[in-house]
A protein has these predicted regions:
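Extracellular beta-strand scaffolds
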Residues: 3-7, 11-13, 17-19, 23-27, ...
Length: 152
């Protein structure tokens, strides 16, 4: 667990990616992703725990695995991408945070998007969960944004 992690305009990749910080993780303009397709359990993939996450203009993506992000304060995903996809198995994106700013950003899962986020700002953004979207939000600001939940 580091005080702060700075991956701005950088690249972090691996079979499983576990990042833990007592401070802020800065991934603005950076990428955090898996370095190939693996046969993981659907619950495995990228796990980020921190006081805050800055993914503005950044990309957090896992193929054939899930993405879990837990922050105390804010997930900033303005013009950023958070994505978990799989052609087989149940993947998901799990978000726990006080605030989510997804202005102009995209959060996409071929499975579920779930968790607890008190305040969501999704102006011009897209939150798409093909297995459903359930973030238990208290406040939602969604000017020209899209939230798509598709149960096939």
């Amino acid at each position: 667990s580091a005080a702060n992690i700075d991956n701005s305009n950088g690249n972090i990749s691996g079979k499983m990616v576990l990042l833990s910080s007592e401070g802020v993780i800065n991934n603005s303009g950076g990428t955090i992703l898996n370095n190939g397709e693996y046969d993981l359990l659907p619950s495995q993939g990228i796990k980020i725990t921190s006081r805050g996450l800055n993914n503005e203009g950044g990309k957090i993506e896992y193929k054939n695995g899930s993405v879990e992000i837990a922050t105390v304060n804010t997930i900033k995903n303005g013009k950023g991408t958070i994505k978990a996809t799989s052609t087989q198995g149940r993947v998901r994106i799990k978000l726990h945070s006080n605030n989510l700013n997804n202005t102009g950003g995209s959060i996409i899962s071929s499975g579920k998007i779930e968790g607890k986020v008190n305040n969501i700002r999704n102006n011009g953004g897209a939150i798409i969960g093909l297995g459903g979207v359930d973030l238990n939000e208290t406040v939602l600001i969604n000017d020209t944004g899209k939230i798509i939940s598709d149960f096939n």
